[in-house]
Structure formats: structure tokens, C-alpha cells
């Protein structure tokens, strides 16, 4: 249930309204927006008389929410959520670009790539330390050593770091990471999601291979219901009948999610296509669709990459792509954030 408050509501009136709802054993969440203040009620609201609530002096109107996700629902939180990542604002009206290799391999590789993507205009650095691979014989990542190398690259470039967590037992390794990424395979690892919800560290949540948008939002709800509101959604392609690309990028998800939720939205054209030559056109399409951030894989030597070289751009290719992203983002009214 959502209660929209009148603009002239007094603080005491709002406090009395919140206290009045305690008798129904529901949780209340007061959201102070730009245009209006809203109280979201989460729990069993069937016993609450809407007319009785509507009669309160400070209440503008009351709405029942049919969707199962509440915290992530735009009706609960009309204004866009802006997530601060070490000074970078995701969802704040400027486009962020997260770039870097699929896997952290060596000190030279990650630092060389980090410097290159920053020079091209990337605002955050990505790199996998713990890698979920289809084959048990494929490179699984450097683990904690990989995170240490990312931190070293951050010291040199100043770029906030984004890396994926696979298992709850590794959570302590991510204490100094700026954004924890939850991959497609773990989107419904609810134990992991709840644990991440008990921190305030930003979480980049990727859509599962065969997941609906509602399932994605319900996974976000798991994190948010534990208290962490810093959730970034990511469209990275879904599995369809088409074998020509690694996945099928669902660009319609971007504007549709923006209607349904206040959370910022990232698009990953690298995993969506699996083909380096398709990354640039799909990145530009994602900017046109209105995404808040792009996540692009870049490797200093893709032909010899330890994982996903086929979808990785060279630094030179990435620099050319960024020129087009910059021009298009300005035209679309969400300009690329400037690297200091």
C-alpha cells in the first residue's frame, strides 16, 4: 500500500500516521521525494481500511500495490535512486561507463588495461577475480589475489572497482571493493542476496539467463528488504532460440524497467552478444534506450585473454567506441560523466 502525503503535511501529523499503522504490524517506509512525500507499507495490509487512511488530514491519496516487489517499485519511490560510488553518481543524470577485462590475469594486464580505459573516458574499472565458468576446466580466476590487483589498479588510476562475488564464504574479500557484482547465475541465490542486503555496499545485480523482469526485481527486493537500497540493475542478454549471438540483448528492458522501478539500469553489450564487433553498435543502442551505465569488456590483448577474448575490445577499439558514446549521450540528454 502507498500513502501519498499532502505537500503541506505537518511533521507531527505524519508521525501520528506512522504510529497509527503500528497496530497492523506492517513496516513503514517514508520516502521524501522532490514533488511529494510517500509512505510505503509492506506486509499484510488487507486489514487496513483505505477510507480510514484517506480521511487523515495529511493524506492526499491511497493506492494498493499489486506488484509483489515493494521497495524496488517506482510507486513507492517516485524519484530516481542515485547511487554514489566513490563520488560517481549512477542514476544521477550522467552516463557512467564500467570497463575492463573479463578476468584479472596479471599485474601488468590489469594495470595496463585500467590506464587505457581511463584515458578513453571510462569512469569505473571492472575485472573478474572469482569467475563462474561453464566448464570446470576453464580458468576460475585469481580469487583474493585478483581483488588485490584491482585495488592496486584503483590506486594508480583512481577508478572505483567493480567485481563479481560467487559465494557467501568469500564476502570478507570484498570489504574494499566499491561495487559488488552478482552475476546472472547467482541472480536467484537468495542467501547471498540477503547477506549483501545487510551491508550498504552498492550491488550490481545482473539479470539471469532466463529470468523475467519481475524475477529480476524480486531479486533486487531480497537485497533491499534487508536494508541495502543501493541496487543497480543490469541487462546482459537472455537466452533465446537464436544461436548467432551468445545471448539476445533485451533493450526493451531498459525503458520498461524505468517505468516499473526507481533503480538505475546498466547494460552489458559484451556478454549480451559475445562478439566484439557487435559491442559498439549495441552499446550505442543501449545509450539511446536510456541506460544509466554501460559495462564493457576491454583487454589489452584479447587474442590471448584467459577468458572471453572473443567479446573483448582492444583499448584502441574501446577509445573509438567511447568517442561515439560521448557524442550520442550528449544528444540523448544524459552526457557521459567526465573523468577527473
What is each of the regions a protein language model found here?
Residues 80-102, 131-136, 258-267:
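N-terminal small/glycine-rich loop or linker at the start of catalytic domains
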Residues 67-98, 323, 330-340:
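N-terminal amphipathic alpha-helix/helix-capping segment at the start of soluble metabolic enzymes
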Residues 6, 142, 158-169, 178-191, ...:
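Catalytic beta/alpha-barrel core
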Residues 8, 95-112, 136-140, 160-164, ...:
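Active-site mouth loops of central-metabolism enzymes
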Residues 85, 199-298:
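Catalytic alpha/beta core domains of metabolic enzymes, predominantly
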Residues 126-144, 300-312:
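Glycine-rich, proline-tolerant flexible connector loops at the mouths of alpha/beta enzymes
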Residues 96-101, 123-127, 161-163, 180-182, ...:
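Hydrophobic faces of well-ordered beta-strands that scaffold small-molecule active sites
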Residues 139-163, 195-202, 251-266, 311-334:
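Alpha-helix-loop-beta-strand connector modules within alpha/beta enzyme cores
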